[in-house]
Amino acid sequence: MTELKLLQCRLDGRYDIEDCLGRGSYAEIYMARDRGAADERFRKVVIKALNVLLQGYQDADLERTLIQNFQNEAIALDRVRHPNIISRLGHGTAIDLTGTAFHYIVLEYLGGGDLSMLCRKEALKLDRALFFLQQICAGLAHAHESGVIHRDIKPQNLLLTTNHEIVKIADFGVAKIEAAEGAITRVGTNIYAAPEHNPLVQTAALDPNSRQSAQTQLTPAADIYSLAKTAYTMICGVPPRAFAHHAITELPAPMSLEPWAPSVLRVLERATQARPGERYQRMQDFWDELSDAALPATRPLIATPAPRHISSDLKLEADLVTAAAPPMNVFAKLSSKLSTSCSRVIRIPNSNGR
């Protein structure tokens, strides 16, 4: 494993990298301070750095796919700006202290963790789960209207503000963009992914055509499937492992004993059918059915009805991070030539000047 040397460094002359928040298979996530931010709300940011060497080997084809993955995420985030979708604040290429070239994206910092962390403590009350689900549906509806299918909706990709009042969709790295060429083919997270875009799952029952045909014809129903599996986790407090690659057909106790359980289960079961055509086709339809199914249980808990419409016009009464970003430029390919065209990080001196 070869990690980037970025801690206590300044990236692009403005981002002071303070901490590593985590590492995935091919990316490193850092918290940084933006010295160029005029607004204090934008001062703390997240740097997502692509590192093709994290697995300890190099593969030219994989490298091209990962770079395209990164490019795809930046393009998608520019296209789908919305209060419930993470904001891209910048992007670029740089070289770390060891001379390793890498691509990076600058994202807004939320600070409230993700829904998987929240649900790990205990299942959410139904009205609280619906509060978050309405926001997620609004963000996904806007993405779909903009020609973007996320493909990897799961609790870990749903981030929360510090006060846990706003949820935002993150990680558009495997999103399918309408009319885009060279679609990313990385598998979505299996337990939440719709069968039509997961080549590890036998999907012959989906359609007489090939699995590849199913992958190239992704529709919003794929995200609806994943969101329904996510809703199960939120409501039940456990991942839907018993229904991996299958429709949700029951809720565990004690949720199954709740008066709302049969009607909510019917919605989740329809949304997770193997055949895309048998699911809800629009995010608005899924939300309408789900909120109606839960209405008897939530009516005593909600003083005034929540707004039902979840279109891209949804407005939230909160200060939202929606900074404008420059037009997306295609990332340069990683090569030895990068050293002449991208910035180098510099070490930040400590208090004694070292």
Regions found by a protein language model. Give the residues of each.
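Protein kinase glycine-rich loop
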Residues: E18-S25, I29
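AlphaC helix of the eukaryotic protein kinase fold
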Residues: L54-R79
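Conserved short submotifs of the Hanks-type protein kinase catalytic core
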Residues: T98-D114, L118
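Activation segment signature within eukaryotic-like protein kinase domains
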Residues: F132-L133
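Protein kinase catalytic-loop region centered on the HRD/HxD motif
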Residues: I136-V148
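C-terminal lobe helix-coil module of Hanks-type protein kinase domains
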Residues: Y192-R299
